[in-house]
């Protein structure tokens, strides 16, 4: 019941966002998007810590390298200094491309979480669903933003996700689940950083304050 109530509130918030955002300024839209991306990154960090609490001893050795994340093919700024040099249109395109690239992986994580061999799989499953909700909410908000910014900001890179199975044994499932979450946490940080730079520009803040 609590989960349903929470989901209802979020969906109402999304509906209000879609209905009202067309009537508010771009800087306010940037602020709302930044708040949602911050929550997305915070949730992914919390999930990663949950997984760390029950990780196989050899997990760190066996887990794929970050370069194996399916979004690694997308060229993105490496830090804030580089992001500050990128145009608004490119930053919003990168944020939307990364967000869209995680639709299918989040579906996989959501389906695997309830039976994950982890003592906190119930909490993990709940947080994954929250990630999906906030990802959808953020995506809807960014769609409204690009409509205000014009056609040149609407380009999205297609990033295929080929993984559809976390493995059969317990160790493989834990490691691959953790790997995907680590990739998502990295990308959620990028999305949050890009949107904060956009927010700074919209509010004319000094670069060092971003």
UniProtKB/Swiss-Prot annotation:
One GO biological process term: positive regulation of gene expression
Cellular component GO terms held in the UniProt record: extracellular space
Q: Where in the cell is it found?
A: Secreted
- Superkingdom of the source species: Eukaryota
Record-level Gene Ontology MF annotations: hormone activity; prolactin receptor binding; superoxide-generating NADPH oxidase activator activity
InterPro entries reported for this sequence: 4_helix_cytokine-like_core, Somatotropin/Prolactin, Somatotropin_CS
Annotated Pfam families: Hormone_1
State the disulfide connectivity: 69-183, 200-210
Q: Please indicate if the UniProt record lists Signal as a keyword.
A: yes
Q: Which SUPFAM superfamilies match?
A: 4-helical cytokines
Q: Which UniProt keywords apply?
A: Disulfide bond, Hormone, Secreted, Signal
Would you indicate the residue range of the signal peptide?
A: 1-23
Similarity comment text for this entry: Belongs to the somatotropin/prolactin family.
Q: Which PANTHER family match?
A: PROLACTIN (PTHR11417:SF5), SOMATOTROPIN,PROLACTIN (PTHR11417)
Identification of the protein by name:
Prolactin
Origin species: Oncorhynchus mykiss
Q: Give me the gene this protein comes from.
A: prl
